[in-house]
């Protein structure tokens, strides 16, 4: 009887120890991709946000552009509390690493979004994007962002594959001074020449465009001297053209 009691006590002791034994540690690889997982919570898997949300795609954008935006969020030129908190204590060299990581991702774009814009509104948006408005000294979007609107090197982003609401919000932020870039702030200057209906039109048209296969930022080409002059852009290091 005593031996049975001893055996029962031993089993109880062993099972109790097993119940409270610490779990084996989970080993997470210390890679840049792993450290940047928090970015995916908002920007989507691998930074390829969908077209029906507010947050932008960051995968495949020019590294110099992404780096400049990370600096802008960290240093207060762009206002977003989540981004500011995430970047507050990050060094410049680490921001460059982050930018290079996302710039190197080559991922497919989602299909074009649906739209409720009228044909007339879309036609107006297409004219602004492709031709600009000389009467208001508005160059075409394609003059800076590339003929295919996929961005130009080293630091001008593409405009395709972005949600309409995000595009409108950014134009509004430039207009009201909520968003800033390194002086001279060309987008602030140009966006203030847009009427609200124009901003809606060009955003609706851009969000509706299909993405050409293999779309990449390109080397900028010389622009025609007959169009509106392009202002200097401090964030891209480009002189007036």
Region roles according to the model:
Residues 26-76, 80:
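The feature marks the first
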Residues 56-61, 144, 157-165:
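Short cysteine/histidine-rich metal-coordination sites, predominantly Zn2+-binding motifs
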Residues 5-7, 38-41, 232:
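The N-terminal extracellular segments of secreted preproproteins, especially immediately downstream
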Residues 22-36, 45, 81-153, 173-241:
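Flexible coil segments in periplasmic/lumen-exposed cytochrome c-class electron-transfer proteins
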Residues 15-23:
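Long, low-complexity intrinsically disordered segments that are proline/alanine-rich
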Residues 9-10, 66, 125, 144, ...:
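Residue-level signal for nonpolar/aromatic packing positions in well-ordered secondary structure
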Residues 62-84, 161-172, 176-185, 222:
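Extended intrinsically disordered, low-complexity coil regions enriched in Ser, Thr, Gly, Ala
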Residues 2-16:
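Bacterial N-terminal signal peptides
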